[in-house]
A protein has these predicted regions:
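Substrate-binding/gating loop at the entrance of the active-site cleft, primarily
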Residues: 97, 117-133
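Conserved N-terminal alpha-helix of the aminotransferase class I/II PLP-enzyme fold
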Residues: 50-98
Length: 246
């Protein structure tokens, strides 16, 4: 801990006393909040809060079991169907967080992949997921299609190309169409993490790709989801341990 402090790497939590729109109260002082992911200010919206109250009164505050036992309610089912329609995909699977969703996707595909290529600035959850399944972490230069092409040329077998869509630190966007074209021509699947784009920009989801987004940013709530082909989502239900055992 002392080393972390000396190297200015020690993490701490600030206690938020009250949040009023784009202002927060810390230690009795009102501050403008520039660090929130609540992009559309829905987390504190009156209609959203009213909907939560209705949901609590109807379904309670917990599911009481995992999805594959007795915890998958009609509310979960309706949300999955609505998200599938919004994203234009065949089926959706809900997860508790984006971190869990990314680990769940990688863990399900573990035995089907020979290589993975990731953008240099991908989110930590994607990097951790890569490490957890035991495949080498290979990263191409950020948003550089030529670098990705060079990396792909050295691979063999079935691959996965992974990118954030909107990158959280700078707000730049991946070239989804070019990445998908490379994936199709090189025995690979493309996966995008759209945590920071969902609800802000129109989803761009190529056929046969994997799409993950969160509900805790622009949507102002919590959770995450994966959308794609029905067979792939069914495969996640069977093989994604973070989903099965949560």
């Amino acid at each position: 801990l002392n080393n972390l402090k000396q190297n200015h790497l020690y993490r701490s939590r600030k206690v938020i006393e009250t949040r009023l729109g784009n202002h927060i109260i810390i230690n009795g002082k009102s501050l403008i909040n520039f660090c929130s992911n609540d992009y559309l200010s829905l987390a504190d919206h009156k209609l959203v809060k009213e909907a939560y109250k209705i949901g609590v009164n109807k379904y309670g505050v917990g599911s009481g079991a995992s999805h594959l036992v007795s915890g998958h309610s009609v509310a979960h089912n309706e949300l999955e169907n609505s998200l599938a329609e919004y994203t234009g995909q065949e089926k959706v699977l809900l997860f508790s967080t984006g971190y869990t969703a990314n680990i769940g996707i990688f863990s399900a595909l573990r035995d089907d992949l020979d290589w993975i290529l990731q953008d240099k600035l991908n989110h930590a959850s994607l990097i951790d997921a890569n490490h957890l399944i035991g495949l080498p972490l290979q990263r191409y230069i950020h948003n550089n299609i030529e670098s990705l092409e060079r990396k792909i040329s050295k691979q063999s077998g079935q691959g996965l190309i992974v990118t954030d869509n909107i990158f959280s630190m700078d707000g730049d966007q991946a070239d989804i169409s070019s990445i998908e074209k490379l994936a199709q021509g090189n025995n690979a699947i493309m996966m995008q993490d759209d945590a920071h784009g969902f609800g802000i920009i129109e989803p761009n989801i190529p056929v046969n790709s994997i799409y993950m987004a969160t509900l805790g940013k622009a949507a102002g709530a919590m959770g995450a989801f994966v959308s794609g082909k029905e067979d792939f989502i069914e495969y996640l239900i069977q093989k994604s341990r973070p989903y099965v055992y949560t």
